[in-house]
Structures are given as C-alpha cells and as structure tokens.
C-alpha cells in the first residue's frame, strides 16, 4: 500500500518513477513484489497500474548467508561477547553473497565495489542456491534428524552423510541448472565447508520446518527434469523419502518428532490412517506439494517407495550408505 501510494503521488506530480528492490529471502522475489504492487494499483485505477508497469522496475535478488534461529545459548554467548543483553541478536557465518539483477530505472549505487554481484538474470543463481545449498541442507536435515544428528555440522562429521551431500549436489542437482561461468565443483565444496562450521550450531530440526513449502523448489523441480531426461536421481529420492519419514512423526530411535509445518494437521491425519506400506501413496495425495503429475508417474512413485522402504528397513544412516552404492 505504501509503495503504491508513493508511486501514485509521483505520477500525479510528474516526478520520475523509482526502482522497487525486494530484499525478501523468497524465490522470484522481484516478480512477487511486482505482482503485489500491480494488483493493488489496479484496484485504484487501470491508468496507475499501466504507468507503474511502464516506468517502474522490480529487480530480482538472491541473498545467501546461513543464519540459524537464535537460541538461549547463542544469546548468552553474544551477551558475554558484547557485555550487553540484546534479545534481537543473531549469530551467522562469515560468508555473505548478494546477487542483484541490474535493472534500475534511475541509476544505482556502485554496489559491486562492496562485493555485490550485478547480473542480467538472477534466476539461474537462485536455482543454484535452492537446489545445491538448500536442497542438500534439507536432505541433511531430514535424514540427519532421523539418524540422531541434532546439528548440520554433526552430519558433516559423518563421512557417508558428507559424501551423500556432495554427490547430491554435483551428480543430481548441478545437471539440472542452467547457470554458466560458475565452477559448481568448487561451489559444492565450499558449501560442505560452510555446513561443517561448528560455531553455527544449525539445528536439523529448524531446517526441517515447513518442508511442504520447501520441497517443490529444493527437490521436486530437479526430479521432474531427471524424469524428462531419464537420468538417475537416487539421492533425491532418498531426500523425499526422508521428508516422508520425518513428517510421519517418529525418528529412528522411536522418539516423537515435533513436526512444524502448515500442513501438519494433514500429515497427522494421513499417519493415523495409513501403515508404513501405505505411507508413500497416502502422502502423494497432497497435490499442493506433488502436483497432479508426479503421483501419476510410475517411475517417480517406484523410486520414492523404494527409498522409503529402505529407510524403514535400515534406518536413515544405513539407508544413506546403501544409496551411495546405487
């Protein structure tokens, strides 16, 4: 509303438009804010919406920095370091990356001097992050939590989990990307080093939250490409199966899982009315996650079912080891 009002006043006074730069850490953020602004402007007048469409730019951006949710321990550490209590303080890793589409209507600061990467199209960078970083993070979160690992750096101390994450990134996610002029092997190795940072104490439970909102971009989009190409994706299958096992609500030690997800009520209903043998087909009925296509694809259903049965039979850690042999 504020953006629309500001643009309305500038148009009324014959002032030039400005660039709306979204800093929200969501996919396709430029188009999201553009659609919101145009939708609200259209309710005021078609002329205003048309003027915004013609004169305002909405560059997409991608940010990358691992920032775990604050805990009592992290807040206490910060208090000791600073000598003051700050309830809003957060811990984060040293690495930082900001990629911005170079599409500004009235000039811009020379942000590249400070390390910002100005690009023509942010989508390839966004896909690289979502599939290689976030996808492997989710893989480690679901399977690591099931195996008893509370933090991502603990997963990295397990050679099998580390190798699985690396193969997932390079063998199964990287081939689905269209980014150029990036050394994806070096990128994958840098991600593994970042994941191994013991100071972050990034909880697998936190990363596993809201999986229904994350799974499509992080894993399922890549799987669809493999299905089209008839290429192998055993670790992606295990990742999806790991999510299914996780939302079923019990880890490998028999402990209850506090599943936090907008669809958790649906998960509970499915778990209450399905056996392990029926669990995959029951969860695949969630079209808001899997769409209409994947549940009807026999190759997809067979791969996820096999991976899920492997998890039930062997447990998460041994299932990772066995999947590496495929």
Where are the model-predicted features located?
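Substrate/ligand-engaging "lid" and interaction regions
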Residues: 1-326
């Amino acid at each position: 509303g504020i953006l629309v009002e500001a643009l309305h006043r500038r148009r009324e006074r014959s002032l030039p438009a400005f660039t709306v730069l979204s800093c929200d850490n969501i996919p396709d953020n430029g188009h999201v804010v553009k659609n919101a602004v145009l939708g609200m402007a259209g309710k005021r007048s078609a002329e205003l919406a048309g003027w915004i469409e013609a004169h305002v730019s909405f560059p997409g951006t991608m940010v990358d920095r691992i920032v775990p949710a604050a805990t009592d321990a992290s807040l206490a550490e910060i208090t000791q370091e600073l000598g003051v209590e700050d309830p809003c303080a957060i811990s984060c890793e040293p690495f930082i990356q900001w990629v911005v589409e170079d599409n500004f209507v009235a000039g811009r600061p020379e942000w590249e001097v400070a390390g910002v990467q100005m690009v023509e199209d942010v989508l390839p960078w966004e896909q690289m992050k979502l599939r290689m970083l976030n996808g492997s993070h989710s893989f480690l979160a679901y399977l690591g939590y099931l195996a008893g690992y509370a933090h991502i750096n603990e997963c990295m101390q397990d050679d099998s989990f580390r190798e699985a994450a690396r193969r997932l990134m390079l063998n199964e996610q990287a081939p689905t990307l269209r980014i150029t002029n990036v050394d994806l092997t070096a990128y994958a190795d840098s991600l593994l080093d970042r994941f191994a940072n013991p100071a972050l104490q990034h909880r697998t439970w936190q990363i596993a939250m809201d999986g229904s909102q994350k799974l499509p971009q992080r894993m399922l989009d890549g799987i669809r490409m493999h299905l089209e190409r008839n290429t192998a994706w055993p670790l992606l299958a295990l990742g999806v199966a790991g999510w299914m096992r996780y939302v079923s609500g019990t880890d490998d030690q028999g402990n209850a899982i506090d599943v936090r997800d907008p669809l958790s009520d649906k998960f509970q209903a499915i778990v209450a009315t399905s056996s392990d043998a029926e669990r995959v087909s029951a969860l695949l009925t969630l079209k808001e996650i899997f769409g209409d296509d994947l549940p009807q694809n026999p190759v997809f259903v067979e791969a996820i079912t096999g991976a899920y049965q492997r998890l039930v039979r062997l447990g998460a850690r041994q299932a990772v080891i066995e999947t590496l042999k495929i």
